[in-house]
């Protein structure tokens, strides 16, 4: 069963397209990261908010990925584009848990 993570990124006014371009570039690396099963990207156009739904083989794989993203400076790249800046980034991520086959 997959470990599911949801990340919500409310864009600053006028930054939706820039965020989409950033995700297009960055998520190819994420999708190629070991043990990433899938990432779905949803844009709520009225609010200018992106929602990423990520599926990993297990929680520790996601933790390894998140550390890599942190170490390579993703927060500094995202900060100018999202409401609340850098302080908002980690607070926008929810590690939901294990997908259930019910």
Residue positions per predicted region:
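Short, surface-exposed ligand-recognition loops at beta-strand->loop->(often short) alpha-helix junctions
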Residues: 10-20
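Short, well-ordered beta-strand segments in beta-rich or mixed alpha/beta enzyme
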Residues: 3-9, 38-66
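An amphipathic, aromatic/His-enriched active-site/gating alpha helix that lines ligand/cofactor pockets
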Residues: 25, 29-37, 55-90
């Amino acid at each position: 069963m997959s470990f599911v993570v949801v990340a919500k990124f409310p864009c600053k006014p006028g930054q939706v397209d820039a965020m989409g371009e950033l995700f297009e570039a960055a998520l190819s690396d994420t999708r190629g990261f070991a043990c990433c099963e899938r990432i779905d990207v949803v844009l709520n156009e009225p609010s200018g908010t992106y929602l990423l739904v990520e599926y990993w083989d297990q929680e520790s794989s996601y933790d390894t990925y998140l550390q890599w993203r942190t170490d390579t400076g993703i927060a500094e790249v995202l900060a100018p584009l999202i409401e609340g800046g850098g302080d908002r980034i980690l607070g926008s991520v929810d590690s939901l848990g294990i997908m259930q086959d019910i």
